Amino acid sequence: MNLTHINEEGRARMVDVSDKDETKREAVAIGSIYMKSETLRRIHEGTIKKGDVLAVAQVAGIMAAKNTSHMIPMCHPIMITGCDISFSLDFENSKIDIKAVVKTVGQTGVEMEALTAVTVAALTIYDMCKAIDRDMVISEIMLVKKSGGKSGLYEREV
């Protein structure tokens, strides 16, 4: 298997996508943040002192998707045509599940943007709640769907 981000001399490079066709592309990523039940209850009730945790995390995730190429060296700057971050509060398992759907029409996919959006949304939740719960765990961040481009559809069984 050849790594596309490595040149003939073994050095890092940004892949040239100029000859690729523009296609409609979408990526879906998910992740979770586990916390104490009291923390989850307070997020749900809106009693975290720093403000509306999920609203801030949603905006942070969208901003992160838009700025992925500034954080991941070999990512291309992409015009994102849509980004949605959603949250599901799971009281039974004391966690918040996070989902990011990112869309574009372009020459390269938005997988890294979706993964970055989920990660930064989770980090934002952690940041806003760390004063009351330093035991939070961010985990299970993964790409679950990718469509468009030459490689077509990818779906992970979850």
Swiss-Prot record:
It catalyses: (8S)-3',8-cyclo-7,8-dihydroguanosine 5'-triphosphate = cyclic pyranopterin phosphate + diphosphate. Transmembrane segments: none annotated. One of its GO terms (biological process) is Mo-molybdopterin cofactor biosynthetic process. Gene3D superfamilies: Molybdopterin cofactor biosynthesis C (MoaC) domain. Substrate binds at M74, C75, H76, M112, E113. The active site is at D127. Pathway: Cofactor biosynthesis; molybdopterin biosynthesis. It is an enzyme of class 4 (lyase). GO terms for molecular function: cyclic pyranopterin monophosphate synthase activity. Its EC number is 4.6.1.17. Keywords: Lyase, Molybdenum cofactor biosynthesis. InterPro entries: MoaC, MoaC_bact/euk, MoaC_sf, MoCo_biosynth_MoaA/MoaC, Mopterin_CF_biosynth-C_dom. Catalyzes the conversion of (8S)-3',8-cyclo-7,8-dihydroguanosine 5'-triphosphate to cyclic pyranopterin monophosphate (cPMP). Homohexamer; trimer of dimers. Belongs to the MoaC family. This is Cyclic pyranopterin monophosphate synthase. The gene is moaC.
